């Protein structure tokens, strides 16, 4: 839903890289090259960014007002 602030495995900060990563991948760049450019080297951090599914916009439509 929301990108984790830190990697679940190693605790490295990854949320600050999400906007740049998702923008560049949507523009058609290779995800591996983008992660290399963003200096994401650990496999656990790469996995967290590569496998994240951003569905928050879809879920917001189903929440009830308080």
UniProtKB/Swiss-Prot annotation:
- What note does UniProt attach to the cofactor annotation? Binds 1 zinc ion.
Spell out the InterPro entries in the cross-references.
RNA_pol_su_RPB10 (IPR023580), RNA_pol_suN_Zn-BS (IPR020789), RPABC5/Rpb10 (IPR000268)
Q: Where in the cell is it found?
A: Cytoplasm
Q: What are its GO biological-process terms?
A: DNA-templated transcription
Q: Is-annotated flag, keyword Disulfide bond? A: no
Co-factor requirement: Zn(2+)
Q: Which residues bind Zn(2+)?
A: 7, 10, 44-45
This entry's Gene Ontology molecular function terms read:
DNA binding; DNA-directed RNA polymerase activity; zinc ion binding
- What reaction does this enzyme carry out catalytically? RNA(n) + a ribonucleoside 5'-triphosphate = RNA(n+1) + diphosphate
A GO cellular component term found in this entry reads:
DNA-directed RNA polymerase complex
Q: Where is the signal peptide?
A: none
Chief site of localization: cytoplasm
The record's keywords, sorted A to Z, are:
Cytoplasm, DNA-directed RNA polymerase, Metal-binding, Nucleotidyltransferase, Transcription, Transferase, Zinc
Q: What is its EC number?
A: 2.7.7.6
From the record, give the cysteines joined by S-S bonds. none
Q: Name one Pfam family in it.
A: RNA_pol_N
Q: Does the keyword Nucleotidyltransferase apply?
A: yes
Physiological role? DNA-dependent RNA polymerase (RNAP) catalyzes the transcription of DNA into RNA using the four ribonucleoside triphosphates as substrates.
Q: Which family does the entry's similarity section mention?
A: Belongs to the archaeal Rpo10/eukaryotic RPB10 RNA polymerase subunit family.
HAMAP family linked to this entry: RNApol_arch_Rpo10 (MF_00250)
Q: Which PANTHER family match?
A: DNA-DIRECTED RNA POLYMERASES I, II, AND III SUBUNIT RPABC5, DNA-DIRECTED RNA POLYMERASES I, II, AND III SUBUNIT RPABC5 FAMILY MEMBER
Q: How does it assemble?
A: Part of the RNA polymerase complex.
Question: Know the name of this protein?
Answer: DNA-directed RNA polymerase subunit Rpo10
Q: What is the lineage of its organism?
A: Archaea, Thermoproteota, Thermoprotei, Sulfolobales, Sulfolobaceae
Gene that this sequence comes from: rpo10
């Amino acid at each position: 839903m929301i990108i984790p602030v830190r990697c679940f495995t190693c605790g490295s900060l990854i949320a600050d890289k999400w906007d740049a990563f998702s923008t560049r991948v949507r523009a058609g760049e290779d995800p591996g090259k983008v992660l290399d450019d963003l200096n994401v080297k650990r496999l656990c951090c790469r996995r967290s960014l590569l496998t994240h599914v951003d569905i928050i916009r879809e879920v917001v439509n189903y929440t009830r007002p308080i």
